[in-house]
Amino acid sequence: MPNPKVFFDMTIGGQPAGRIVMELYADVTPSTAENFRALCTGEKGAGRSGKPLHYKGSSFHRVIPNFMCQGGDFTAGNGTGGESIYGAKFADENFVKKHTGPGILSMANAGPGTNGSQFFICTTKTEWLDGKHVVFGQVVEGMDVVKEIEKVGSSSGRTAKPVVVADCGQLS
């Protein structure tokens, strides 16, 4: 089976910014890819927090130019929340794939075995994250949109304008 492809339709400051299409490495990280895929479709319904297990309407709360764009906290919206389809947190599946350059999709965490729903898209090679964060996909279309998101970021991670996943889902 080919790897699934999912999308984010993004807005920046309330204006449509375009679509990011990501291939998920279900062949290498099946559990991590499935978590992200299901959070894109929203098919699992509400989570333990009572909020839908869905990226739709969530924001990229932390954007650092020449590093990464982080999102996926659909419970608190500020980097303190998020929830996986497996319950609150799940284990690091493996570290087979590396942070090789722009467009790499990886799980944000707060230490070993603390994966939830937060993720980041690299805007450069981040090899120091290898073995600490699970790489589970890559951007295949829309790196121009990622670059636009990067432009509203700052060294502190705070965004100058809201960056929102207006819609999301699965393409294949």
From Swiss-Prot:
Its EC number is 5.2.1.8. It catalyses: [protein]-peptidylproline (omega=180) = [protein]-peptidylproline (omega=0). It is found in: Cell membrane; Nucleus. SUPFAM superfamilies: Cyclophilin-like. Disruption phenotype: Decreased salt tolerance. InterPro entries: Cyclophilin-like_dom_sf, Cyclophilin-type_PPIase, Cyclophilin-type_PPIase_CS, Cyclophilin-type_PPIase_dom. Induction: Induced by salt (NaCl), osmotic stress (mannitol) and abscisic acid (ABA). It holds the Pfam family Pro_isomerase. It is an enzyme of class 5 (isomerase). GO terms for molecular function: cyclosporin A binding; peptidyl-prolyl cis-trans isomerase activity. Mainly expressed in stems, leaves and cotyledons, and, to a lower extent, in roots. The cv. Suxie No.1 (SX1) is more tolerant to salt stress than the cv. Tianlong No.1 (TL1). Belongs to the cyclophilin-type PPIase family. This is Peptidyl-prolyl cis-trans isomerase 2.
